[in-house]
Every structure is written in structure tokens, then in C-alpha cells.
């Protein structure tokens, strides 16, 4: 017969297990109730509840994250704007616009608008810097103008004119290497994405710390550039998990050691090059030479700030330009009539490569129009430049948006909206040349380099590179797509486009002696 002690112990154990089950059930029920009440609040009572959009996106960020991680965010946003209009709530605390609200969100503000505060970058979109120091891309309201004062002169029109000889050396090497491709076993069949990358990465490295990546010299990617391309998808993953600290901690803990080592090497390479350049007495007019002018001033950049800025400028000043050049080439070759017009302008303007100068290509209307149209259809940064609404809130495009909300003009959806453009999906450079068919186009919504005091520092450099390369390419070669049936623009985007190879057949134009 069991003892009273044993019976009591069994009863206690049974009650304890029962209590735990009841407690767990209550906790689960309360969690469901909380989520239900929270969803009701977000959908029907939140200050953003008046903004159009799907209810599932209003009560959870998961649909946004799902499309972000799949590389479909831009096209998902486009479908939402087609359904709901110019302004859409795409997450509980995020709103996307495709109307012209650049002045409201991105411009420098005066008067009453200025009293509301500055629209700062949404840092949740960016990976935490390796050295824990933000670059000019994510800097706060105090640090940004201080950094910009030191960096901007390196990319001014004046400096670019002074640097023309250096830039032209890379243009010549680019053309020479392509001529070599027509003479070897490839028979002129080349991946233009690769060659545009070689060109832009070499130039930005030279302009940042006076040392080329030598991609064009070696006809191959530098190891640092290869590491960059391998990390593109991780940018979107990092942005997604930053919204969920718990998962962020798990990912950091479980990240393979080889990936962590690659990230260390990626950053260390830049830090080492910066250190060597700062210690050098070279007078080479690169970014570091401009930064060194401020080294003894109280507001000069410290070493961590210099490292972070060099890192971000190498990426922002190369990949985006190569992307646009690739897209423009594809669109021209897919539209023979437009290609013929631009080729006629180029070959009617220049008789010899030596005539293709920065000044000369600045006066070519159809070239400018073709590049502008390519930027519209295929913006290198296809999503929006995220900003945080300051203070208690502000009016944006006629809508009251509460403070703390992340807002942006979603570029690809805006550029492909028939509310902004006639024939939005067609490559028609004439829309920028006064063609009356497009007189109702809302071109003010186009800002591929952003706008306001935080617009892209490298806009002038990008324009110079794009114009020179496109002019020389069409002067030296006849081009055709190897696979004209391929829809090359059908790509995933992970902050940047995940570009496919762009296979093109080059045929030299024997109008003069090719570069030797």
C-alpha cells in the first residue's frame, strides 16, 4: 500500500504539470489575443490607417520582408501602387510614394517646414558599419554636412576636368581590351556587364586612394570586387533582420566563420589602402588628398570616418554606373531604330577617338536623352531612398504622416507608372527631346541620384563616365545582342540589381587605327 508521502508527491507532480500546461495555454491564448488586438489597432486605429494599402501589410512587416528576401520587393511595390494609387502603406510603419514628393521629403526646408526637423536616413536599411562608425551615407544631421564639405570637392566638375587625362587612360584601356576580345577565340562575344564593371571599379579606386584595382589591366575582377558581388544578397538579409533583434542575434551567432572572415578581409583591404595613402606624400588629386587638407582642423574626419567613407564610396561610385551602362546598352540593342539614331550622332560628331572629350560629349542631345531614358526605365537604385519623418509628423503629398514613419519615393514603380509617364515601359529617348507625345510626362518625379542636400556626390562623375564610354563604344564598334530573345531586364533586386550576363557581339569599325 503506497505511503502517504508517495501519494502526496504524485499529487504534487500532477498538479505541477497541470499548472504548467494551464499556464502555457494561457500564455499562448494571451499572445494570440495580443496579436489580434495589435492587428486591429494597426489596421483601423493607427495614424496611418487612412493611407491606402493592403490590410495584411498594415498589420505585419512579414509580406514586405518576404518579397525583400526573394528579390521581388520592387515589383511587389509596383503592383501595390497599380492597385492602390500614388501613396501606399507597405508595412505598419512605412509608406511608399510614386508622386513628386521629393520637395517634401528630401529637399532642404525653410520656414515652418524647417521647424519640424530633418528627414534623416532610415538606418534600419543599412548594415551596421564594421568599425561602428557611420559614413556620409547614413550620417546624422550634424556629421553629414561636415563630411560632405571634405568629400564633395573630390567629385566636383573642376576636379573632373583636371582628372580627364586619368579618366581617358581608363577609357582607352577599356576600348583596347574590347578590341583584343574581337581578335581572340571569343570572336568578339563579350559579357558587357563584366567589362563595364572593370572600368568603373578601376576609376573609383584611383579617385578614392590613387590606386587602381587593375581589373582592366588583368581582364579580371580584383578579389575585393568578387567579395563585394558575393555579399549583395546579404545586404537585403541584413536589412530584413535588423527589424527583428532576436533573429539578428541568432544570425550573428550562427554565421559561418568563413563568412565572418570574408567580411573582415573585405573591410581590412580598404582600411589598409587608406592607411597607405594617408601616410604617402603623393600629390595625386584623389579623395584622400582632399581629406588630408582638413586633417588639422577640429572638424576634420577621424580615421574611422575616413575608412567608412572610403568603403561606401568604392561601392556607390562603381556598381551603380556599371549597372546603368549595362541597362542602356541592352535597351539600345533591343531597339535598333534608337541605336541607329545614337550611332549616327556619335559618328557624325567624331572622326577620331581623340575628339571624344568631356566637353564634347556634354553637347550630344540624343546621347543624353538615351542615358536619361535608361535611368528612368532601369534606375540603379530601384527602391526608394528611405527617410524617417521627424518630430510629431508632417504633411507629405497632401497626406499627414506621423513622426517615426519611414517614407520614400519608390523609383522603379514611379518611373513605370502610367500616371507619371506615357508608354512607361517603352524605351523612347525622344520623351526628353520635346516629343509632343510625351508632353504630359511627369519628369519631375525622376531623381535617380536623389535630391536635396543628401543627393549623390558622384553624379558628375557618373555622367562623365557614361557619356565617354557610350560614345567610344559606338564610335569603335558595331554591336548586337547574341540572344535578342532574352529579357535581360527581368532581374531580381537586392538593394542593387542582380544583373545577368549581357552577352554582346562586337565588330570593330575600321574608320581609323584602333588604339595600340
Swiss-Prot record:
Record-annotated membrane-spanning stretches: 20-42
GO cellular component assignments: membrane
Pfam family, one: p450
InterPro entries on file: Cyt_P450, Cyt_P450_CS, Cyt_P450_E_grp-I, Cyt_P450_sf, Cytochrome_P450_monoxygenase
Disulphide bridges, residue numbers: none
Compartment(s) of residence: Membrane
Keywords: Glycoprotein, Heme, Iron, Membrane, Metal-binding, Monooxygenase, Oxidoreductase, Transmembrane, Transmembrane helix
Glycosylation sites: 131, 184, 415, 420, 442
EC number(s) per entry: 1.-.-.-
Protein topology in the membrane: Single-pass membrane protein
One of the record's GO molecular function terms: oxidoreductase activity, acting on paired donors, with incorporation or reduction of molecular oxygen
Binding positions for heme per the UniProt entry: 456
GO annotation (BP), single: biosynthetic process
Enzyme class (EC, first level): oxidoreductase
Listed pathway(s): Secondary metabolite biosynthesis
Stimuli inducing this protein: Expression is positively regulated by the leucinostatins biosynthesis cluster-specific transcription regulator lcsF.
Named cofactor requirement(s): heme
Function: Cytochrome P450 monooxygenase; part of the gene cluster that mediates the biosynthesis of the lipopeptide antibiotics leucinostatins that show extensive biological activities, including antimalarial, antiviral, antibacterial, antifungal, and antitumor activities, as well as phytotoxic.
Family label: Belongs to the cytochrome P450 family.
Protein name (database record): Cytochrome P450 monooxygenase lcsI
Organism: Purpureocillium lilacinum
Amino acid at each position: 500500500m503506497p505511503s502517504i508521502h508517495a501519494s502526496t508527491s504524485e499529487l504534487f507532480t500532477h498538479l505541477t504539470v497541470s499548472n504548467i500546461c494551464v499556464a502555457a495555454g494561457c500564455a499562448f491564448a494571451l499572445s494570440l489575443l495580443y496579436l489580434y488586438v495589435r492587428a486591429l489597432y494597426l489596421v483601423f486605429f493607427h495614424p496611418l490607417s487612412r493611407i491606402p494599402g493592403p490590410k495584411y501589410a498594415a498589420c505585419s512587416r512579414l509580406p514586405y520582408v518576404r518579397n525583400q528576401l526573394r528579390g521581388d520587393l520592387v515589383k511587389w511595390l509596383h503592383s501595390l501602387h497599380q492597385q492602390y494609387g500614388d501613396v501606399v502603406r507597405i508595412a505598419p510603419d512605412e509608406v511608399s510614394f510614386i508622386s513628386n514628393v521629393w520637395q517634401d521629403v528630401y529637399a532642404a526646408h525653410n520656414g515652418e517646414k524647417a521647424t519640424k526637423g530633418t528627414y534623416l536616413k532610415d538606418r534600419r536599411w543599412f548594415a551596421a558599419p564594421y568599425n561602428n562608425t557611420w559614413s556620409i551615407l547614413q550620417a546624422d544631421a550634424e556629421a553629414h554636412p561636415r563630411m560632405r564639405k571634405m568629400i564633395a570637392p573630390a567629385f566636383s566638375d573642376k576636379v573632373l576636368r583636371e582628372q580627364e587625362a586619368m579618366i581617358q587612360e581608363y577609357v582607352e584601356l577599356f576600348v583596347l581590351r574590347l578590341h583584343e576580345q574581337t581578335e581572340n577565340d571569343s570572336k568578339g562575344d563579350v559579357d558587357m556587364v563584366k567589362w563595364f564593371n572593370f572600368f568603373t571599379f578601376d576609376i573609383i579606386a584611383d579617385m578614392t586612394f590613387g590606386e587602381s584595382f587593375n581589373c582592366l589591366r588583368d581582364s579580371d575582377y580584383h578579389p575585393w570586387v568578387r567579395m563585394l558581388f558575393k555579399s549583395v544578397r546579404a545586404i537585403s538579409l541584413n536589412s530584413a533582420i535588423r527589424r527583428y533583434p532576436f533573429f539578428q542575434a541568432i544570425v550573428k551567432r550562427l554565421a559561418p566563420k568563413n563568412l565572418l572572415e570574408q567580411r573582415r578581409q573585405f573591410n581590412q583591404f580598404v582600411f589598409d589602402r587608406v592607411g597607405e595613402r594617408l601616410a604617402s606624400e603623393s600629390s595625386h588629386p584623389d579623395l584622400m588628398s582632399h581629406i588630408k587638407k582638413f586633417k588639422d582642423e577640429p572638424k576634420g574626419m577621424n580615421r574611422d570616418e575616413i575608412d567608412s567613407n572610403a568603403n561606401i564610396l568604392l561601392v556607390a561610385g562603381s556598381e551603380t554606373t556599371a549597372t546603368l551602362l549595362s541597362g542602356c546598352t541592352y535597351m539600345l540593342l533591343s531597339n535598333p531604330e534608337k541605336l541607329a539614331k545614337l550611332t549616327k550622332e556619335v559618328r557624325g560628331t567624331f572622326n577620331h577617338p581623340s575628339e571624344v572629350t568631356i566637353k564634347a560629349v556634354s553637347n550630344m542631345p540624343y546621347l543624353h536623352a538615351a542615358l536619361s531614358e535608361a535611368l528612368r526605365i532601369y534606375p540603379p537604385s530601384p527602391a526608394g531612398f528611405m527617410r524617417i519623418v521627424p518630430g510629431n509628423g508632417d504633411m507629405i503629398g497632401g497626406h499627414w504622416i506621423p513622426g517615426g514613419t519611414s517614407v520614400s519615393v519608390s523609383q522603379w514603380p514611379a518611373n513605370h507608372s502610367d500616371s507619371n509617364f506615357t508608354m512607361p515601359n517603352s524605351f523612347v529617348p525622344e520623351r526628353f527631346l520635346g516629343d509632343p507625345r510625351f508632353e504630359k510626362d511627369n519628369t519631375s518625379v525622376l531623381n535617380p541620384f536623389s535630391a536635396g542636400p543628401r543627393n549623390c556626390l558622384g553624379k558628375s562623375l557618373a555622367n562623365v563616365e557614361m557619356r565617354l564610354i557610350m560614345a567610344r563604344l559606338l564610335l569603335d564598334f558595331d554591336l548586337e545582342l547574341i540572344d535578342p530573345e532574352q529579357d535581360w531586364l527581368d532581374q531580381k533586386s537586392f538593394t542593387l540589381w542582380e544583373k545577368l550576363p549581357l552577352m554582346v557581339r562586337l565588330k570593330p569599325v575600321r574608320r581609323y587605327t584602333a588604339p595600340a
